[in-house]
């Protein structure tokens, strides 16, 4: 991971594909007839873990796009390929937001049933913009290179609270600790 400096190698075991399968199925809600688009480059962990392994292990068709960013082009791809599940980054959502709601509303995006974000905090305005632009909130989730798979998520069944990254997946315990690593009570 190179988030805070020069890239460092991250080792993941082969069994990690089981986590990608499970989170693809239960967090991303991947179904056999879906057309899935993860906009992350395969040079990043999201591009491999959730651009390739999660959809492949769930038997889902993936859209692969190698071109540059253009709001009109991205919405045209969703329309043309009838994308049903879309996984993108908050930076991309903010760039799409600059285009306003008029551009996405020129396209038939009715195939989309689920939209998610990952890679950095999603500002509440991004969630609201998704609702205004195409009738779906972005479901934020959290993980990092070192965890190898989604750890905290807004599940498909959850009502999204703008600004919330969701709840831990089964088997993950989370909490807030102080400077001595002691748990801090809610409030």
PLM regions: where:
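Active-site beta-alpha turn of Rossmann-fold NAD(P)-dependent dehydrogenases/reductases
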Residues: 1, 40, 148
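Residue-level recognition of short loop/turn positions
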Residues: 4, 178-181
């Amino acid at each position: 991971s190179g988030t805070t400096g020069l890239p460092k190698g991250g080792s993941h075991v082969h069994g990690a594909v089981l986590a990608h399968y499970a989170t693809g199925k239960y967090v991303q809600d991947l179904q056999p007839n879906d057309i899935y688009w993860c906009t992350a480059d395969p040079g990043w962990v999201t591009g491999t873990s959730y651009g390739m392994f999660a959809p492949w292990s769930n038997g889902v068709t993936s859209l692969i796009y190698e071109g540059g960013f253009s709001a009109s082009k991205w919405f045209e791809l969703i329309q043309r390929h009838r994308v049903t599940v879309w996984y993108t980054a908050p930076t991309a959502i903010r760039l799409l937001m600059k285009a306003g709601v008029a551009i996405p509303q020129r396209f038939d995006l009715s195939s989309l049933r689920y939209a998610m974000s990952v890679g950095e905090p999603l500002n509440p305005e991004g969630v609201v913009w998704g609702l205004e632009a195409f009738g779906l909130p972005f479901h934020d989730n959290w993980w990092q290179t070192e965890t190898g798979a989604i750890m905290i998520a807004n599940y498909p069944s959850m009502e999204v609270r703008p600004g919330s990254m969701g709840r831990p997946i089964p088997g993950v315990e989370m909490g807030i600790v102080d400077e001595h690593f002691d748990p801090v009570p809610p409030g």
